[in-house]
Regions:
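Right-handed parallel beta-helix/beta-solenoid
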Residues: 13, 54-85, 102, 120-123
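Extracellular beta-strand-rich solenoid/capping regions of secreted or surface-exposed proteins
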Residues: 91, 104-118, 126-172
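Solenoid scaffold repeats with emphasis on beta-solenoid/beta-helix
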Residues: 61, 96, 103, 109, ...
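Short hydrophobic/aromatic-rich beta-strand motifs
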Residues: 21-38, 61-64, 96-98
C-alpha cells in the first residue's frame, strides 16, 4: 500500500526536518520561511531530506529552459525563460543566474548598472541573437557577464558586447567580461567606443575571453576608450585587437592564431 500523503508543519524560523521526521511520500512545510521539504531515496546512495523549490533570495533572478517570462524569476521554480526578461526587471545589485541551455534572445539586451549575468557553465549555456543587425548586449558601469557562450551570425561590425549608444553613462567601474566564448561570425566580441561613455577611462575589462568569431574582430577600442585585456585567445579573426582614433589597451597573456591581423592601430585622438 502506498504511503499516505501528509504535510508536517513548523513555524520555527530556519527549522527543517531530519530524515527520521519523514516517511517517503510525506512533506514538511516551514510556514515561517515558506519552504517545503520531502525525502529522496536513491538505491545505492541513501535517503536524504531535500528542499522543494526554495524561497526567494533578494536581488537574485533565475533563468532556465523550463521557465516562463511571465514568472517572477525570483526562484528556480519560478524562473524566467529568457535573459532579456530577467534583465528587464533587474535593478542595481542584481545577480542573474542562467541555467544550462540554449537561449535565442531578442537583442539588444540592455543591462542596467551594477548587474551580473552568470551562466552555469560556458560550455553548457549558449546565447544566440535573433536580430543580425543589432548588438547582443549593451552594458553599463559595474556590470559583469560570465560563463556564457555566444553563438550565431550577425552583420559585419555588430558587437556582442558594447556600451549602450542610447544611454551614455559615466564609467566609474568598468564592465567586466570573464570566462566567455564568442562564436558569433562577423561580430566584434568587445566594442569599447569612447564616444558612447564619459569619464576618465571609458573602459571595459576582460579576462579569459576566447573568440572564434570567423571574419570578425576580437576587441575594438576607439575614440579614446580603454580596455584591459587578460587571456584573450582568438582564432580565424580578421583582427584580434584593433585600436582606432586614440583608443588604448593593455594586453597580457593573450594569443592570436590564424586569421589576418593580430594587432591593428590607426588614427589619433584629441588628447595627446
Amino acid at each position: 500500500m502506498a504511503t499516505p500523503f501528509r504535510i508536517k508543519r513548523s513555524a520555527v524560523p530556519g527549522k527543517g526536518p531530519s530524515v527520521s521526521d519523514l516517511q517517503l511520500g510525506e512533506l514538511a512545510l516551514n510556514t515561517y520561511d515558506a519552504e517545503l521539504y520531502t525525502l529522496r531515496s536513491r538505491p545505492g546512495i541513501g535517503t536524504e531530506v531535500v528542499k522543494i523549490g526554495g524561497a526567494a533570495i533578494e536581488n537574485v533572478l533565475y533563468v532556465n529552459k523550463d521557465g516562463n517570462d511571465g514568472n517572477s524569476g525570483s526562484t528556480p521554480a519560478d524562473a524566467k525563460a529568457t535573459l532579456k526578461a530577467a534583465v528587464g526587471i533587474a535593478s542595481e545589485g542584481t545577480a542573474i543566474k542562467v541555467a544550462a541551455g540554449t537561449y535565442i534572445e531578442n537583442n539588444p539586451i540592455k543591462v542596467p548598472k551594477q548587474v551580473s549575468i552568470v551562466g552555469d557553465s560556458l560550455r553548457e549555456v549558449t546565447v544566440s541573437p535573433q536580430n543580425a543587425d543589432e548588438d547582443m548586449f549593451h552594458v553599463s558601469p559595474g556590470d559583469m557577464i560570465s560563463e556564457l557562450t555566444f553563438s550565431g551570425t550577425v552583420d559585419k561590425g555588430i558587437a556582442v558586447i558594447a556600451f549602450d549608444p542610447d544611454k551614455i553613462q559615466y564609467v566609474n567601474q568598468s564592465p567586466y567580461i570573464r570566462f566567455c566564448t564568442n562564436r558569433v561570425a562577423n561580430s566584434i566580441g568587445l566594442k569599447v567606443d569612447g564616444n558612447k561613455a564619459v569619464g576618465p577611462f571609458k573602459s571595459m575589462v576582460t579576462d579569459s575571453y576566447t573568440q572564434y568569431n570567423v571574419s570578425g574582430i576580437g576587441v575594438s577600442v576607439s575614440n579614446e576608450g580603454y580596455a584591459q585585456i587578460v587571456s584573450l585567445f582568438t582564432m580565424n579573426l580578421d583582427e584580434a585587437v584593433a585600436c582606432h582614433s586614440g583608443g588604448q589597451c593593455d594586453v597580457t597573456n593573450s594569443n592570436s592564431s590564424f586569421g589576418n591581423y593580430g594587432l591593428v592601430a590607426d588614427g589619433v585622438g584629441a588628447l595627446q
